[in-house]
Amino acid sequence: MRFYKIISFMLLGLDDTDSPDGMCTTYLGALIANELKRRGFTVTNHRLVRLNPNVIWKTRGNAGISLEISGGDSTVVFEIACEFVERFARFECEKTNPGVVVVESPPDPAFYYQALQRFCTIEETVKRLERIGALYKGYKNGRGLIGALAAVSSVLPDKTYECLAYRKNEVLGTPRIYAEEGFFTSEEQTAPHTWDTVDFIRREIVCVPHGKDPVLYGIRGDTPKWAIKATGFLETEEPAFSQIWETNQGTDAHLLPLPDGGPIEGESYRFSGVVESLPITNRGGHVQFTILSNGMEIPVFAFEPTKYFRNAVRELVVGDEITICGSFQKGVLHLEKFRPNLLATQKSRSSPRCPICGGRMTSAGKDKGYKCRECSGKVRDVPDQERTLQTKWYEVPPGSRRHLAKPAVRMKDDI
Protein backbone atom coordinates (compact mmCIF):
# COMPACT_ATOMS: atom_id res chain seq x y z
CA MET A 1 0.00 0.00 0.00
CA ARG A 2 1.26 3.47 -0.90
CA PHE A 3 0.89 6.27 1.63
CA TYR A 4 0.62 9.92 0.62
CA LYS A 5 1.55 12.96 2.65
CA ILE A 6 -0.81 15.93 2.51
CA ILE A 7 1.30 19.06 2.06
CA SER A 8 -0.08 22.50 2.89
CA PHE A 9 2.44 24.26 0.65
CA MET A 10 4.70 23.29 -2.24
CA LEU A 11 6.14 24.86 -5.37
CA LEU A 12 6.47 23.27 -8.80
CA GLY A 13 9.05 24.75 -11.18
CA LEU A 14 9.22 24.07 -14.90
CA ASP A 15 11.40 25.34 -17.74
CA ASP A 16 12.76 24.71 -21.22
CA THR A 17 9.92 22.67 -22.71
CA ASP A 18 9.34 24.85 -25.78
CA SER A 19 11.18 25.38 -29.05
CA PRO A 20 11.25 27.99 -31.84
CA ASP A 21 8.84 25.73 -33.74
CA GLY A 22 6.18 25.25 -31.10
CA MET A 23 5.02 24.60 -27.54
CA CYS A 24 5.18 27.12 -24.71
CA THR A 25 6.24 26.49 -21.12
CA THR A 26 3.37 28.62 -19.78
CA TYR A 27 0.91 26.53 -21.80
CA LEU A 28 2.32 23.30 -20.43
CA GLY A 29 2.31 24.78 -16.93
CA ALA A 30 -1.34 25.75 -17.32
CA LEU A 31 -2.20 22.23 -18.51
CA ILE A 32 -0.47 20.77 -15.46
CA ALA A 33 -2.29 23.23 -13.18
CA ASN A 34 -5.64 22.20 -14.67
CA GLU A 35 -4.81 18.53 -14.17
CA LEU A 36 -3.78 19.13 -10.56
CA LYS A 37 -7.06 20.92 -9.88
CA ARG A 38 -8.95 18.05 -11.47
CA ARG A 39 -7.23 15.68 -9.05
CA GLY A 40 -8.17 17.75 -6.01
CA PHE A 41 -5.11 19.94 -5.52
CA THR A 42 -5.39 23.68 -4.96
CA VAL A 43 -3.25 25.91 -7.19
CA THR A 44 -3.04 29.33 -5.55
CA ASN A 45 -0.56 31.12 -7.80
CA HIS A 46 0.74 30.89 -11.36
CA ARG A 47 4.06 32.72 -11.79
CA LEU A 48 6.00 33.45 -14.98
CA VAL A 49 9.62 34.41 -14.31
CA ARG A 50 11.83 35.94 -17.00
CA LEU A 51 15.55 35.36 -16.57
CA ASN A 52 18.76 36.87 -18.02
CA PRO A 53 17.80 37.92 -21.57
CA ASN A 54 21.42 37.66 -22.74
CA VAL A 55 21.68 33.89 -22.29
CA ILE A 56 22.69 32.49 -25.69
CA TRP A 57 21.18 29.01 -25.23
CA LYS A 58 17.62 30.17 -24.49
CA THR A 59 14.86 28.60 -26.58
CA ARG A 60 12.82 31.80 -26.99
CA GLY A 61 12.08 34.22 -24.16
CA ASN A 62 14.18 32.63 -21.39
CA ALA A 63 11.44 32.14 -18.81
CA GLY A 64 10.57 29.56 -16.20
CA ILE A 65 7.23 29.07 -14.45
CA SER A 66 6.23 28.11 -10.94
CA LEU A 67 2.94 26.94 -9.47
CA GLU A 68 2.06 27.34 -5.78
CA ILE A 69 0.17 24.21 -4.76
CA SER A 70 -1.45 22.74 -1.66
CA GLY A 71 -3.71 19.89 -0.67
CA GLY A 72 -1.79 16.78 -1.67
CA ASP A 73 1.45 14.84 -1.89
CA SER A 74 4.50 16.44 -3.50
CA THR A 75 5.50 13.14 -5.08
CA VAL A 76 2.20 13.00 -6.96
CA VAL A 77 2.69 16.57 -8.19
CA PHE A 78 6.18 15.67 -9.38
CA GLU A 79 4.96 12.56 -11.21
CA ILE A 80 2.14 14.45 -12.94
CA ALA A 81 4.51 17.21 -14.04
CA CYS A 82 7.04 14.73 -15.44
CA GLU A 83 4.29 12.85 -17.26
CA PHE A 84 3.10 16.04 -18.98
CA VAL A 85 6.64 17.11 -19.87
CA GLU A 86 7.35 13.74 -21.45
CA ARG A 87 4.11 13.97 -23.41
CA PHE A 88 4.30 17.57 -24.65
CA ALA A 89 7.88 18.95 -24.56
CA ARG A 90 9.67 19.46 -27.89
CA PHE A 91 12.54 17.04 -27.32
CA GLU A 92 13.46 17.04 -31.01
CA CYS A 93 14.83 20.59 -30.68
CA GLU A 94 18.52 20.71 -29.79
CA LYS A 95 17.99 23.67 -27.44
CA THR A 96 15.06 22.08 -25.57
CA ASN A 97 16.33 20.53 -22.32
CA PRO A 98 13.41 20.43 -19.85
CA GLY A 99 13.69 20.59 -16.09
CA VAL A 100 11.12 19.83 -13.37
CA VAL A 101 11.56 20.83 -9.71
CA VAL A 102 9.28 20.39 -6.68
CA VAL A 103 10.10 21.89 -3.27
CA GLU A 104 8.14 22.11 -0.02
CA SER A 105 9.50 25.52 0.99
CA PRO A 106 10.85 28.47 -1.02
CA PRO A 107 14.62 28.15 -1.65
CA ASP A 108 17.09 31.00 -1.12
CA PRO A 109 16.19 33.78 -3.61
CA ALA A 110 19.91 34.37 -4.26
CA PHE A 111 19.76 31.71 -6.96
CA TYR A 112 16.88 33.52 -8.68
CA TYR A 113 18.84 36.77 -8.76
CA GLN A 114 21.89 35.00 -10.13
CA ALA A 115 19.85 33.46 -12.96
CA LEU A 116 18.08 36.78 -13.56
CA GLN A 117 21.10 39.08 -13.63
CA ARG A 118 24.08 36.85 -14.27
CA PHE A 119 24.61 33.19 -15.23
CA CYS A 120 24.22 29.76 -13.61
CA THR A 121 25.66 26.38 -14.51
CA ILE A 122 23.83 23.07 -14.59
CA GLU A 123 26.35 21.61 -12.15
CA GLU A 124 25.84 24.25 -9.44
CA THR A 125 22.06 23.98 -9.93
CA VAL A 126 22.08 20.22 -9.31
CA LYS A 127 24.22 20.72 -6.19
CA ARG A 128 21.69 23.22 -4.82
CA LEU A 129 18.79 20.89 -5.60
CA GLU A 130 20.52 18.05 -3.75
CA ARG A 131 21.34 20.31 -0.82
CA ILE A 132 17.74 21.47 -0.32
CA GLY A 133 16.25 18.00 -0.82
CA ALA A 134 14.16 18.90 -3.86
CA LEU A 135 12.42 16.47 -6.14
CA TYR A 136 13.87 17.13 -9.58
CA LYS A 137 14.38 15.67 -13.02
CA GLY A 138 16.40 17.05 -15.91
CA TYR A 139 15.92 15.85 -19.46
CA LYS A 140 18.71 15.65 -22.04
CA ASN A 141 21.44 17.95 -20.66
CA GLY A 142 19.11 19.18 -17.90
CA ARG A 143 19.58 22.90 -18.52
CA GLY A 144 15.90 23.53 -17.77
CA LEU A 145 16.64 22.79 -14.12
CA ILE A 146 18.22 26.25 -13.91
CA GLY A 147 15.01 28.04 -14.87
CA ALA A 148 12.85 25.67 -12.83
CA LEU A 149 14.86 26.27 -9.65
CA ALA A 150 15.04 30.00 -10.35
CA ALA A 151 11.25 30.13 -10.73
CA VAL A 152 10.54 28.47 -7.37
CA SER A 153 13.25 30.64 -5.75
CA SER A 154 11.87 33.89 -7.15
CA VAL A 155 10.72 36.89 -5.15
CA LEU A 156 8.97 39.77 -6.90
CA PRO A 157 9.27 43.13 -5.09
CA ASP A 158 7.70 44.62 -8.22
CA LYS A 159 5.29 42.56 -10.26
CA THR A 160 3.01 42.77 -13.27
CA TYR A 161 0.47 40.41 -14.79
CA GLU A 162 -0.16 38.84 -18.16
CA CYS A 163 -3.38 37.30 -19.42
CA LEU A 164 -2.33 34.60 -21.87
CA ALA A 165 -4.99 33.11 -24.13
CA TYR A 166 -4.21 29.73 -25.69
CA ARG A 167 -5.39 28.28 -28.99
CA LYS A 168 -7.43 25.15 -29.52
CA ASN A 169 -5.52 22.05 -30.61
CA GLU A 170 -7.34 21.78 -33.92
CA VAL A 171 -6.11 25.17 -35.14
CA LEU A 172 -2.48 24.96 -34.01
CA GLY A 173 -0.16 25.74 -36.89
CA THR A 174 -2.77 27.74 -38.81
CA PRO A 175 -2.84 31.57 -39.07
CA ARG A 176 -4.39 33.25 -36.04
CA ILE A 177 -7.77 34.87 -36.66
CA TYR A 178 -8.39 38.28 -35.11
CA ALA A 179 -9.61 41.80 -35.85
CA GLU A 180 -6.72 44.25 -35.58
CA GLU A 181 -8.85 47.22 -34.53
CA GLY A 182 -9.93 45.52 -31.32
CA PHE A 183 -6.36 45.50 -30.03
CA PHE A 184 -5.96 49.23 -30.70
CA THR A 185 -9.27 49.92 -28.94
CA SER A 186 -8.16 47.77 -26.03
CA GLU A 187 -4.97 49.77 -25.55
CA GLU A 188 -6.80 53.09 -25.92
CA GLN A 189 -9.30 52.11 -23.24
CA THR A 190 -6.92 50.56 -20.70
CA ALA A 191 -3.54 52.34 -21.04
CA PRO A 192 -1.48 53.23 -19.04
CA HIS A 193 -2.62 50.26 -16.94
CA THR A 194 -1.77 47.96 -19.86
CA TRP A 195 1.10 48.19 -22.35
CA ASP A 196 2.79 46.45 -25.28
CA THR A 197 -0.53 45.47 -26.84
CA VAL A 198 0.08 47.54 -29.97
CA ASP A 199 2.51 50.05 -31.46
CA PHE A 200 0.41 53.11 -32.31
CA ILE A 201 3.20 54.81 -34.27
CA ARG A 202 3.84 51.88 -36.60
CA ARG A 203 0.22 50.63 -36.44
CA GLU A 204 1.36 47.13 -35.49
CA ILE A 205 -0.12 44.46 -33.24
CA VAL A 206 2.53 43.52 -30.68
CA CYS A 207 0.81 41.05 -28.34
CA VAL A 208 -0.01 38.38 -30.94
CA PRO A 209 2.82 35.94 -31.72
CA HIS A 210 3.49 34.77 -35.26
CA GLY A 211 4.95 31.32 -34.66
CA LYS A 212 3.48 27.84 -34.22
CA ASP A 213 3.24 28.04 -30.44
CA PRO A 214 -0.18 27.70 -28.75
CA VAL A 215 -0.42 31.32 -27.53
CA LEU A 216 -3.21 33.33 -29.17
CA TYR A 217 -2.33 36.62 -27.48
CA GLY A 218 -0.86 38.01 -24.26
CA ILE A 219 -2.15 41.17 -22.57
CA ARG A 220 0.17 42.74 -19.97
CA GLY A 221 -1.10 44.95 -17.18
CA ASP A 222 -0.61 46.38 -13.70
CA THR A 223 -3.22 44.08 -12.17
CA PRO A 224 -5.21 40.98 -13.16
CA LYS A 225 -8.30 43.19 -13.34
CA TRP A 226 -6.79 45.49 -15.98
CA ALA A 227 -5.39 42.63 -18.03
CA ILE A 228 -8.76 40.89 -18.08
CA LYS A 229 -10.62 44.12 -18.84
CA ALA A 230 -8.38 44.70 -21.86
CA THR A 231 -9.38 41.35 -23.37
CA GLY A 232 -13.02 42.45 -23.43
CA PHE A 233 -12.35 44.68 -26.46
CA LEU A 234 -10.80 41.91 -28.56
CA GLU A 235 -12.38 40.03 -31.45
CA THR A 236 -10.45 36.82 -32.06
CA GLU A 237 -10.88 33.14 -32.74
CA GLU A 238 -12.27 31.40 -29.66
CA PRO A 239 -9.43 30.47 -27.30
CA ALA A 240 -9.25 27.06 -25.64
CA PHE A 241 -8.71 28.77 -22.28
CA SER A 242 -6.89 31.71 -20.67
CA GLN A 243 -4.61 32.02 -17.67
CA ILE A 244 -3.46 35.00 -15.62
CA TRP A 245 0.24 34.85 -14.78
CA GLU A 246 2.00 36.88 -12.09
CA THR A 247 5.30 38.03 -13.62
CA ASN A 248 8.49 40.04 -13.28
CA GLN A 249 7.98 41.39 -16.80
CA GLY A 250 8.23 45.15 -17.23
CA THR A 251 10.07 45.65 -13.93
CA ASP A 252 13.74 46.20 -14.91
CA ALA A 253 14.61 43.44 -12.46
CA HIS A 254 17.52 42.40 -14.69
CA LEU A 255 19.37 45.73 -14.33
CA LEU A 256 22.47 46.12 -12.15
CA PRO A 257 24.54 49.20 -11.23
CA LEU A 258 27.66 49.60 -13.35
CA PRO A 259 30.62 47.82 -11.66
CA ASP A 260 33.72 49.85 -10.77
CA GLY A 261 35.77 47.62 -13.05
CA GLY A 262 33.53 48.21 -16.05
CA PRO A 263 30.69 46.32 -17.73
CA ILE A 264 30.76 42.52 -17.88
CA GLU A 265 29.72 40.51 -20.91
CA GLY A 266 26.13 39.29 -20.67
CA GLU A 267 25.01 41.58 -17.83
CA SER A 268 22.52 44.45 -17.99
CA TYR A 269 22.91 47.85 -16.36
CA ARG A 270 21.38 51.16 -15.42
CA PHE A 271 23.82 54.03 -14.90
CA SER A 272 24.40 57.71 -15.60
CA GLY A 273 27.13 59.41 -17.59
CA VAL A 274 28.05 62.10 -20.08
CA VAL A 275 27.81 61.77 -23.86
CA GLU A 276 31.39 61.75 -25.18
CA SER A 277 30.80 61.57 -28.94
CA LEU A 278 28.10 62.67 -31.34
CA PRO A 279 25.79 59.83 -32.40
CA ILE A 280 26.61 58.49 -35.85
CA THR A 281 24.55 56.19 -38.05
CA ASN A 282 26.49 53.15 -39.21
CA ARG A 283 25.89 51.01 -42.25
CA GLY A 284 22.79 48.96 -41.52
CA GLY A 285 21.08 51.82 -39.70
CA HIS A 286 22.61 51.27 -36.25
CA VAL A 287 23.20 54.47 -34.25
CA GLN A 288 26.35 54.61 -32.11
CA PHE A 289 27.77 57.00 -29.52
CA THR A 290 30.12 56.84 -26.54
CA ILE A 291 29.22 57.58 -22.93
CA LEU A 292 31.69 58.44 -20.15
CA SER A 293 30.80 57.03 -16.73
CA ASN A 294 33.09 56.69 -13.70
CA GLY A 295 36.07 57.42 -15.91
CA MET A 296 35.16 54.65 -18.37
CA GLU A 297 34.25 55.17 -22.03
CA ILE A 298 31.53 52.73 -23.07
CA PRO A 299 30.26 52.33 -26.66
CA VAL A 300 26.46 52.47 -26.87
CA PHE A 301 24.37 51.20 -29.78
CA ALA A 302 20.72 51.71 -30.72
CA PHE A 303 20.31 48.97 -33.30
CA GLU A 304 18.22 49.19 -36.46
CA PRO A 305 15.32 47.06 -35.11
CA THR A 306 14.65 49.81 -32.54
CA LYS A 307 13.31 51.91 -35.45
CA TYR A 308 12.06 55.39 -34.48
CA PHE A 309 13.78 55.22 -31.08
CA ARG A 310 16.99 56.01 -32.99
CA ASN A 311 15.64 59.46 -33.87
CA ALA A 312 15.76 60.46 -30.20
CA VAL A 313 19.24 58.98 -29.83
CA ARG A 314 20.45 61.08 -32.79
CA GLU A 315 19.38 64.24 -30.90
CA LEU A 316 22.02 63.71 -28.21
CA VAL A 317 25.08 65.97 -28.27
CA VAL A 318 28.46 65.91 -26.57
CA GLY A 319 28.11 67.02 -22.95
CA ASP A 320 24.56 65.77 -22.40
CA GLU A 321 24.17 64.13 -18.99
CA ILE A 322 21.94 61.07 -19.32
CA THR A 323 20.82 57.90 -17.55
CA ILE A 324 20.80 54.78 -19.71
CA CYS A 325 19.59 51.18 -19.44
CA GLY A 326 20.79 48.28 -21.55
CA SER A 327 22.66 45.00 -21.89
CA PHE A 328 26.38 44.63 -22.49
CA GLN A 329 27.03 42.17 -25.29
CA LYS A 330 30.02 41.71 -27.58
CA GLY A 331 31.74 44.77 -26.18
CA VAL A 332 28.93 47.30 -26.62
CA LEU A 333 25.89 48.39 -24.63
CA HIS A 334 22.59 47.54 -26.34
CA LEU A 335 20.44 50.54 -25.46
CA GLU A 336 16.93 49.82 -24.10
CA LYS A 337 16.04 53.34 -22.98
CA PHE A 338 17.59 56.61 -21.84
CA ARG A 339 16.63 59.77 -19.97
CA PRO A 340 18.32 63.17 -20.39
CA ASN A 341 19.14 64.66 -16.98
CA LEU A 342 20.89 67.84 -18.12
CA LEU A 343 21.15 68.96 -21.73
CA ALA A 344 24.31 70.66 -22.95
CA THR A 345 24.17 74.08 -24.58
CA GLN A 346 24.76 73.87 -28.32
CA LYS A 347 25.34 76.79 -30.65
CA SER A 348 23.12 76.99 -33.71
CA ARG A 349 24.68 75.55 -36.86
CA SER A 350 22.66 77.83 -39.16
CA SER A 351 23.01 81.59 -39.64
CA PRO A 352 20.62 83.58 -37.42
CA ARG A 353 17.81 85.85 -38.60
CA CYS A 354 18.34 89.61 -38.41
CA PRO A 355 16.56 90.99 -35.32
CA ILE A 356 15.73 94.20 -37.28
CA CYS A 357 14.43 93.09 -40.69
CA GLY A 358 14.19 89.32 -40.35
CA GLY A 359 16.59 88.59 -43.20
CA ARG A 360 19.15 85.79 -43.07
CA MET A 361 22.50 87.06 -41.72
CA THR A 362 26.02 86.13 -42.84
CA SER A 363 29.30 85.82 -40.97
CA ALA A 364 31.09 89.09 -40.26
CA GLY A 365 34.40 87.25 -39.86
CA LYS A 366 36.04 85.05 -37.26
CA ASP A 367 34.82 85.92 -33.77
CA LYS A 368 32.98 88.99 -35.16
CA GLY A 369 29.45 87.64 -35.11
CA TYR A 370 26.97 88.12 -37.96
CA LYS A 371 25.86 91.01 -40.22
CA CYS A 372 22.74 91.57 -42.29
CA ARG A 373 23.16 92.27 -46.01
CA GLU A 374 19.77 93.93 -46.20
CA CYS A 375 19.87 96.51 -43.39
CA SER A 376 23.45 96.26 -42.06
CA GLY A 377 22.19 95.07 -38.68
CA LYS A 378 24.72 93.18 -36.55
CA VAL A 379 24.66 90.55 -33.79
CA ARG A 380 27.71 89.62 -31.76
CA ASP A 381 26.86 86.22 -30.31
CA VAL A 382 25.74 83.06 -32.04
CA PRO A 383 22.36 82.04 -30.61
CA ASP A 384 21.95 78.72 -28.82
CA GLN A 385 20.26 75.98 -30.77
CA GLU A 386 16.89 74.93 -29.38
CA ARG A 387 17.01 71.35 -28.05
CA THR A 388 14.11 69.02 -28.77
CA LEU A 389 14.90 66.40 -26.12
CA GLN A 390 13.03 66.60 -22.82
CA THR A 391 13.76 65.32 -19.33
CA LYS A 392 11.80 62.10 -19.76
CA TRP A 393 12.38 58.47 -20.67
CA TYR A 394 12.88 57.60 -24.33
CA GLU A 395 12.35 53.91 -25.05
CA VAL A 396 12.46 51.37 -27.85
CA PRO A 397 9.15 50.55 -29.63
CA PRO A 398 6.86 47.99 -27.97
CA GLY A 399 7.77 45.36 -30.56
CA SER A 400 11.48 45.75 -29.78
CA ARG A 401 11.19 45.84 -25.99
CA ARG A 402 12.64 43.02 -23.95
CA HIS A 403 10.22 41.24 -21.63
CA LEU A 404 11.95 42.48 -18.48
CA ALA A 405 12.40 46.10 -19.57
CA LYS A 406 10.15 48.50 -17.68
CA PRO A 407 8.02 50.61 -20.06
CA ALA A 408 7.95 54.38 -19.62
CA VAL A 409 4.28 54.26 -18.53
CA ARG A 410 5.49 52.45 -15.39
CA MET A 411 8.26 54.99 -14.71
CA LYS A 412 6.29 58.15 -14.01
CA ASP A 413 7.77 58.39 -10.50
CA ASP A 414 11.29 57.70 -11.80
CA ILE A 415 12.44 61.20 -12.65
From Swiss-Prot:
Superkingdom assignment: Archaea
One GO CC term, this protein: cytoplasm
EC number: 6.3.4.22
Enzyme class: ligase
Catalytic activity: cytidine(34) in tRNA(Ile2) + agmatine + ATP + H2O = 2-agmatinylcytidine(34) in tRNA(Ile2) + AMP + 2 phosphate + 2 H(+)
Gene Ontology terms for molecular function: ATP binding; ligase activity, forming carbon-nitrogen bonds
Pfam family, one: Zn_ribbon_TiaS
Keyword tRNA processing: yes
Keywords recorded for this protein, A-Z: ATP-binding, Cytoplasm, Ligase, Nucleotide-binding, tRNA processing
Signal peptide: none
Keyword Transcription: no
Any GO BP annotation: tRNA wobble cytosine modification
Subcellular location: Cytoplasm
Family membership: Belongs to the TiaS family.
PANTHER family xrefs: TRNA(ILE2) 2-AGMATINYLCYTIDINE SYNTHETASE TIAS (PTHR40705:SF1)
Function: ATP-dependent agmatine transferase that catalyzes the formation of 2-agmatinylcytidine (agm2C) at the wobble position (C34) of tRNA(Ile2), converting the codon specificity from AUG to AUA.
Name of the protein in its database record: tRNA(Ile2) 2-agmatinylcytidine synthetase TiaS
